[in-house]
Amino acid sequence: MRLLTIVFSNHCDLDCTYCCVQSKNLSPVNADFKQIKEFIDQYIEDEACIEFYGGEPTLHKDLVKEILDYIDSLDIDVYTRLYTNGMFKDWTDEEIVSVSNRISETLISLDGFTFEESKQRFETEDEFNQVMKNIKTVLTTSTFLGISTVLYGRAKFENMFNNYKLFRSIGVNYFSYEPLTIYNDNKPVVIPKEFFKEFLIQINRIYQDSIENYPDDTYLFVAKELLSSKWFNQGELTQCSKMVRAISPRGNVYMCRDHAANEEELFYSPKVIQFLNKNNFKNDNESFPIIEQNENNLTSCPVKNIQYRDSKMEGSLYWLEDEVQELYIEPLYRAIQALDNKRKDAYNDMLTYSKTVTKYLMKEDANEIFKVSIN
């Protein structure tokens, strides 16, 4: 499935402290429908996924509707996904319902079930309450609604299972998690071992509850920063240069939505960013030669691979050794894939292993966990 991302602008009505978009609200232009239409025409194929991304795409309500109208006019099977902070500024409930019914999947970013847990996202409790109200509105529609949580700080990890249960109680059945990175060239903070241990405990508890209580009605996603290509490499299916295209507000095409969203900072900012300039991540006649040379090497993200290479990282990532991948990460992703694909024949074995891993994690020190095997 080809992934096509439309970045409307880098403007947003929130200011999350951990946002991956730099130079926010500095887009000199907004996305242009003519350029977006040409982008879709060039790259669309049957069963492609078209993402609405930002910034905050719901700030561009009329353009969202115009693009949906154009997609509907195409005689092709397309999956659509909206990434949003859930504010839906200046949208009526009727507009939220109308557009949600036309979108395949809606992924709302939210850190927890309470305002206290989400203070890095919202200035006021009224903003948080508005998002919770909008979630309940979207749940009345046909769109596949997910909650996307960025995990940082001890409480976020410790509350994963409880928040999962609370969101389930209002009808949410799709949960996406993004742990902080394992290596500090990607983001400002490295996930500590004890937090990583807590993440593994909590995600396994969520998996176990899903299998035991909602096997036909739960979908999980964990950001692939933790993957090792030694086992995840699926050839072109996991190669961004082959499968991914993203159009920026300026109309430039990249193979990574983060590049399209951060275009002003990466390619037009007065300051020189040596890493990006020397590796040339822009489209070159439908080719991304630097990316292609570094795909499926060490991790599933070629940009991270280049960062690791430039940092003289070889063979392992920080403390996430091959043994850790084999004991915790690979089984976790295979279990999630089985759950999402409803491969019920695999449930029992994976559930047993998950419970064994959880018991082990809960009784051992974090430093020990990441250097010894489960007997």
Regions found by a protein language model. Give the residues of each.
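Canonical Radical SAM [4Fe-4S] cluster-binding loop centered on the CxxxCxxC motif
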Residues: M1-K34
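Short acidic donor-binding/metal-coordinating loop in glycosyltransferase active sites
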Residues: F8, G54-G55
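Secreted/processed peptides and extracellular or luminal domains of membrane proteins
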Residues: Y18, Q22-N25, A246, N262, ...
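Radical SAM enzyme [4Fe-4S]-AdoMet core and its adjacent flexible, acidic
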Residues: P28-V29, K34, K119-Y254, D258-E264
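Radical SAM/AdoMet-radical enzyme domain recognition
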Residues: I36-E51, H60-P179
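Class I S-adenosyl-L-methionine
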Residues: P57-T58, M255
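Flexible mid-to-C-terminal extensions adjoining Fe-S/redox cofactors in radical SAM and related proteins
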Residues: D258-N375
